[in-house]
């Protein structure tokens, strides 16, 4: 199916709505473990392109914060906007560049996803660290970064690496 601009805008809107609604299924505690808002953003980048993935990634946590009150705008929604913006950008850009290189589509998915996850989490950690420097009451340590980015979130990372390639390949 030839993807038109209207299709990409429509699908991006649908994925944005999904990013706002999916966290209701997990609740707050399980949401930080399963990262349900991340899946629609990664899909948006891969399917619609890096421009849409970047935009929807930035908008989704901020819009959800305004509409629902969760995540809190500061520091969580702001740092998540950077993280998810990077997710959408990197997943879309790498998928676009690698899919025509005679590589297995599954391999392209994994390279795009893992790169986006690593860079997005680094962006999240950097923003949280800078916020901690500015706001001395919100200090963000390296152990807090490792815990929040990888240790607590590993089930969500694994779920993304399983669910997204299945959806892309099917």
Predicted regions span which residues?
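Loop-helix junctions at membrane interfaces
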Residues: 1-170
């Amino acid at each position: 199916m030839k993807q038109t601009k209207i299709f990409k805008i429509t699908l991006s809107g649908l994925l944005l709505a999904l990013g706002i609604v999916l966290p209701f299924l997990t609740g707050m505690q399980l949401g930080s473990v399963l990262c349900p808002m991340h899946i629609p953003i990664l899909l948006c980048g891969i399917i619609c392109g890096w421009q849409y993935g970047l935009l929807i990634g930035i908008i989704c946590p901020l819009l959800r914060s305004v509409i629902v009150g969760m995540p809190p705008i500061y520091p969580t929604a702001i740092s998540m906007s950077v993280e998810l913006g990077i997710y959408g950008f990197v997943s879309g850009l790498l998928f676009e560049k690698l899919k025509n290189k005679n590589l297995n589509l599954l391999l392209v998915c994994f390279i795009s996803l893992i790169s986006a996850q690593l860079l997005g989490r680094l962006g999240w950690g950097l923003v949280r660290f800078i916020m901690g420097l500015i706001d001395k009451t919100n200090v963000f340590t390296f152990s807090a970064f490792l815990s929040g980015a990888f240790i607590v979130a590993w089930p969500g990372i694994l779920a993304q690496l399983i669910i997204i390639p299945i959806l892309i390949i099917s």
